[in-house]
Amino acid sequence: MLWYCEFYKVENIKITEGAFFLDILKFMQHLKLSVVPDSTGMVGFNPGPKTHDGLYFEKQSDEEGNKTLNLMMRMANRLIGEGMRTTVSDLEKDWHEDMIWWGPGGIGASYTYDGYLKGHTGPFEENLEFVEFSGHVLENSEGNFGGWFGWPNLKMRPKGNYMGLTQNTDLIGEMRVVDLYRRDKNKIAENWILIDHLHFLKCIGIDLLERNRKLKD
């Protein structure tokens, strides 16, 4: 299954810009290609919102949309301020305890605070050094849903065995990230994430597509 996300800018009833993200690494995992390491989270199908209300056909309340955007930005600013490090006390401020984190290829999905710390933030913090937050191209919300993307959002330097791929280098990798959120009352309930891991890994000298090609030759 090929997971993707699209963003478009419309001016004068025509599309003027677009951004298209493909989670090729997740696709490679579904194909069980040997060059892709095991994930620390669950690898499978990432569904839509469990509330089944992700499609809006009518204008939503600006007030509700602003609540969602403010929550997203509060959480992000706290995370960036902590150098991309997360604790349970941090999560308690912005996330429901039964949060679902639908992670990208290479990481996988996590459930609850403990699952999130074990499946994502623990390995992420242990094996990557935060270098720079590069900002977002778009931050937007409507009703209980919102999201952003960057090109890139983050710059990180490997310092260990990130995603099972050891790389001793001073090279800095760019992370192009999509984050989509569902707010439930005053906290985040679900989060869908895409990371262009193939681009990040290539920045630090790891070309998984080339490795896979060589295995087939």
Regions found by a protein language model. Give the residues of each.
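C-terminal and inter-domain tail/linker signature
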Residues: 1-217
